[in-house]
A protein has these predicted regions:
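C-terminal catalytic/substrate-binding lobe primarily of soluble NAD(P)-dependent oxidoreductases
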Residues: 13-14, 21-215
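Rossmann-fold dehydrogenase core element
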Residues: 2-10
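Hydrophobic/aromatic pocket-lining and membrane-interface residues
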Residues: 1, 20
């Protein structure tokens, strides 16, 4: 039919992919070189799962049970980098304390997709970020015991436990009241450059529909 499929052009992964690019452009302007380490930190996300999203994640988990070898692909941040393998990446599968931001951070459930796309973009731009580039994404939970407890809870919880059925999803009011806020921190020469990417409306619906339309 001549149709073209544009992958990863919604909330996953445009705000993250372009957020890193915007940050690196700023870092290069100021320091003459890119940051070798960037931390993506989700500071806020107000939205709901849809039944279709939940079904897709469920199908992914079912496929992993049938083909355990796919776990290696899912866990490899360079799986979309056409054979290129960079340095070991920061761990993002359990809660950690981000000392530079003074907050506990938890694993972000879409990081396995976003990190792969960020590294692929780096490859497609002839390693504009450098071949030693490191990147991870985590979810900010706050400082102190409360932050640690929240991070531990998210790390051990199942996001699909009370997911809606396919065809179900958030109301129009809920979609319009959603939002997100992602911080990107580029570490370079013992300094850190911060930029933020913010969006209105539910990340997976209102924001994603706008990004998909613009990508098309």
């Amino acid at each position: 039919s001549g149709s073209r499929i544009v992958f990863s052009c919604g909330f996953d992964s445009i705000p993250f992919d372009l957020g890193v690019l915007f940050l690196q452009n700023e870092v290069v302007k100021r320091f003459g070189k890119p940051a070798s380490n960037v931390r993506g930190r989700v500071r806020g996300m107000n939205g709901e799962f849809s039944g279709g999203t939940a079904a897709s994640l469920g199908a992914t988990m079912a496929a992993l049970k049938e083909k355990p070898e796919l776990f290696a692909v899912l866990a490899n941040p360079f799986a979309l980098s056409n054979g290129f393998t960079g340095p070991d990446q920061p761990a993002d599968i359990k809660p950690v304390f981000d000392e530079k931001l003074d907050t506990w951070v938890a694993p972000f459930f879409m990081a396995p997709i976003n990190t792969k796309n960020v590294h692929r973009s780096n490859l497609l731009m002839n390693h504009f970020y450098g071949e030693d580039f490191c990147y991870n994404e985590m979810w900010v939970q706050g400082s102190g015991d409360a932050g640690k407890a929240a991070a531990d809870f998210i790390s051990s919880s199942n996001p699909l436990s009370d997911a809606p059925k396919p065809g179900e999803g958030p109301s129009r009011e809920s979609r319009e009241n959603g939002n997100y806020d992602v911080l990107f921190c580029g570490d370079i020469d013992e300094q850190s450059v911060h930029v933020s990417v913010k969006g209105d409306m539910d990340p997976g619906y209102g924001s994603t529909s706008k990004m998909i339309s613009e990508s098309a």
